[in-house]
Amino acid sequence: MARTQAEPPASQPDARAAWLRDQLERANYAYYVLDQPDLPDAEYDRLFGELQQLETDHPDLVTPDSPTQRVGGEVAGGFTPVVHDAPMLSLNNGFADEDIAAFDKRVADALGKTTDLAGSVTDPVEYACELKFDGLAISLRYEHGVFVQASTRGDGTTGEDVTENVRTIRSIPLKLKGAHVPALLDVRGEVLMFKRDFARLNERQRAAEQREFANPRNAAAGSLRQLDPKITAQRPLSFFAYGIGVLDGMPMPDTHSALLDWYESFGLPVNRERAVVYGADGLLGFFRKVGEKRESLPYDIDGVVYKVNRRDEQDRLGFVSRAPRFALAHKFPAQEALTRLVAIDVQVGRTGAITPVARLEPVFVGGATVTNATLHNEDEVRRKDIRIGDTVIVRRAGDVIPEVVGALLERRPDDAAEFVMPTECPVCGSKIERLPDEAIARCTGGLFCPAQRKQALWHFAQRRALDIDGLGEKIIDQLVELNLVRTPADLFNLGFATLAELDRFAEKSAQNLLDSLEKAKHTTLARFIYGLGIRHVGESTAKDLAKHFGSLTPIMDASIEELLEVNDVGPIVAESIHQFFAEEHNRTVIEQLRAPGKVTWPEGPPAPKAPQGVLAGKTVVLTGTLPNLTRDAAKEMLEAAGAKVAGSVSKKTDYVVAGADAGSKLAKAEELGIPVLDEDGLHQLLEGNTP
């Protein structure tokens, strides 16, 4: 998109109105025609509201093509235009409680509702309340109960024919249920995509190496407006009916709630999250109830809709140019907003994960003022092409951490700077490393880094590590926050007086912890290695390292090639171990832990080198009775030669050694074509000769 003209100040209403019209029309085109929305709803609403106010204050600024005089965008090429028999109008918006009270008062006054001396309505208005779905509005046309046409809203007067695509939506009946159906019925409703279906669609997009959709609304709109209905058929779209256009051949239901019940009797999908309430208090009660469950709903909504329930009262209230007077959309606080990204810092997590964080000009979004937002990782920053100085879209939903969704490239300043991942931890100065095939970079100073301190201490004290009973998370929190412990080595410097002064820590608890620390000084090499918290080194790998090297120093000094010789240690684990011990800060803490009077363990000899003969790594099965060797003796000899002795025959078996009375294992070996040896053949293998 080309760069837009400079933003004129409010002191120039003519220029300001022209600029606002331009911004809104660009947004409409991107949303309705290109299916590539580039402006958050909150920003669109703000600009639209400003233009409305300008035109109210300066009526001479109103133009026939102003966005305030129509509903949406132009009809896209590739689809046949459809003129709606009844316009598909949008709704006016309300945001604050005061807006809802004012709406109720306008409606009550217009309907001549009676009030008491205090001005309160004694005969409150009856409203039908529904959800405001975040999808694409469409109209379904049924003739004598048979589905004949579907069209999008378009500009409210003329939409696009999407009949063949809508036929693929399984929730939409192609024929209405019941013996008595209208001669003509225009059903208004919303095409949307459920959250679970959206997640599955994006999984398929990733697997096919195709572009992912930003959100369910974009996915629904893009899927519905495919030129090839076969593509739409592969997309998991849903539909909810919520309104009516034209009806012929049957009387109109007396209320809106009755209309929705009527739709259900025809087999049309109608959302059950609806209610009939009275007055402003009833409206606000419904809004709050829905707000509490919003995040748990299986689909996205951006508010609720209020409609005067009685049809005769709707008719009395009528319409303004672009919206009905009898209805209002009550929108939740915007979940997306625009602001400027002023810097990108990195923060260090409890496990050493380095996360880029956007520092933002303050913006109100999702019900709170946001100044920071996560950028997840370096690859995400590159993929989204986010730069310092950009105007960015910030999203905050519920209690979810705010995130930067993307940048508006057309607003990018010439001096926008790319993000560069630091090479040293901003907290402790240790090296930042990123393992192959991992998206997250990490600080390698696990034992030393203050940001990882609590996690390192908690892991060190685990039952499978040093097993320091009584050192729980709450005690660790106090020790760290009072600056009594910086590294695991400091634990062994704690005294009774210090521990006894901790909050809610009695003298007996202090003594028990000291006894546990004294006991922890006598451990095993495997437990100590596990307690260091090396990434990808679990309890089993720690045992393998201890068994292979016998003592700690050879492990600390081992090359990646030497580490790869350890059982079940692959390239990623070897790289992680090597990085950990290459960091001087970690080696310093280990040296402190091994100081006199601290942690000790019995040293053992390194394991013998693995055999390299013809049996090394081979799988052998023993069956039957051998003339001179017991089965246990044969097994011991095979394992000493580097073979694995298995209990059953499979395609992975290399040899079967068969003696007298060999049974089904011999038959299975012959069936699979596996070499079968007698005792002499076994001895040849053990001597290094291939039989």
UniProtKB/Swiss-Prot annotation:
InterPro entries named in the record: BRCT_dom, BRCT_dom_sf, DisA/LigA_HHH, DNA_ligase, DNA_ligase_AS, DNA_ligase_CS, DNAligase_adenylation, DNAligase_N
SUPFAM superfamilies: BRCT domain, DNA ligase/mRNA capping enzyme, catalytic domain, Nucleic acid-binding proteins, RuvA domain 2-like
Catalysed conversion reaction: NAD(+) + (deoxyribonucleotide)n-3'-hydroxyl + 5'-phospho-(deoxyribonucleotide)m = (deoxyribonucleotide)n+m + AMP + beta-nicotinamide D-nucleotide
PROSITE patterns documented for this protein: BRCT, DNA_LIGASE_N1, DNA_LIGASE_N2
Sequence similarity: Belongs to the NAD-dependent DNA ligase family. LigA subfamily.
Name of the protein in its database record: DNA ligase
Gene: ligA
Native source species: Burkholderia ambifaria (strain MC40-6)
Function: DNA ligase that catalyzes the formation of phosphodiester linkages between 5'-phosphoryl and 3'-hydroxyl groups in double-stranded DNA using NAD as a coenzyme and as the energy source for the reaction. It is essential for DNA replication and repair of damaged DNA.
EC number: 6.5.1.2
One Pfam family named in its UniProt record: DNA_ligase_aden
UniProt cofactor(s): Mg(2+); Mn(2+)
Example of a GO biological process term: DNA replication
Ligand binding (Zn(2+)): C425, C428, C443, C449
Recorded GO MF terms: DNA binding; DNA ligase (NAD+) activity; metal ion binding
Domain BRCT: 610-691
Keyword Zinc set for record: yes
